[in-house]
Swiss-Prot record:
Main localization, broad class: plastid
Any GO CC annotation of this UniProt entry: chloroplast thylakoid membrane
Subunit note: F-type ATPases have 2 components, F(1) - the catalytic core - and F(0) - the membrane proton channel. F(1) has five subunits: alpha(3), beta(3), gamma(1), delta(1), epsilon(1). F(0) has four main subunits: a(1), b(1), b'(1) and c(10-14). The alpha and beta chains form an alternating ring which encloses part of the gamma chain. F(1) is attached to F(0) by a central stalk formed by the gamma and epsilon chains, while a peripheral stalk is formed by the delta, b and b' chains.
Record GO terms (molecular function): proton-transporting ATP synthase activity, rotational mechanism
UniProt topology in membrane: Single-pass membrane protein
Keyword set includes Cytoplasm: no
Native organism: Nicotiana sylvestris (Wood tobacco)
Gene this chain is encoded by: atpF
Further remarks about this protein from its record: In plastids the F-type ATPase is also known as CF(1)CF(0).
Task of the protein: F(1)F(0) ATP synthase produces ATP from ADP in the presence of a proton or sodium gradient. F-type ATPases consist of two structural domains, F(1) containing the extramembraneous catalytic core and F(0) containing the membrane proton channel, linked together by a central stalk and a peripheral stalk. During catalysis, ATP synthesis in the catalytic domain of F(1) is coupled via a rotary mechanism of the central stalk subunits to proton translocation.
Protein name (database record): ATP synthase subunit b, chloroplastic
Amino acid sequence: MKNVTDSFVSLGHWPSAGSFGFNTDILATNPINLSVVLGVLIFFGKGVLSDLLDNRKQRILNTIRNSEELRGGAIEQLEKARSRLRKVESEAEQFRVNGYSEIEREKLNLINSTYKTLEQLENYKNETIQFEQQRAINQVRQRVFQQALRGALGTLNSCLNNELHLRTISANIGMLGTMKEITD
């Protein structure tokens, strides 16, 4: 133990020039002066330091408040944008649905009008065919009648005398007139 004490004592006697060591002389090291200076620094520096810290704290709080306000504004704008997006999406969906239903409606209208046009064309065709058939039947009747009349006249001319011939012609002309009135 004596060795340890001797080493501390010898440290206190080392010369201070150019070397490191402990100076145990209280008056030489000015611990009183140092404590006074430190006390003054702490007393006056505490106010300055607390002012600096308070200012820094206020700036941080203001920045946080501004950030919160900006965040709130951004959230509000985001909600408005989402609301507009939902509205636009619903309108787009309505336009899409309405567009599809409009297309289907137009398609059905086109199909219906095409069927009506085809029906009308079929009716016109049938009427034209019936008219042409009736006309052909009338022409055939007229030709058959004319041939029958010529044949009858030829037979009558060869078999009858002039007076009977004239009476038969008059009767046939009368019948022709009646037939013509019936057909017209």
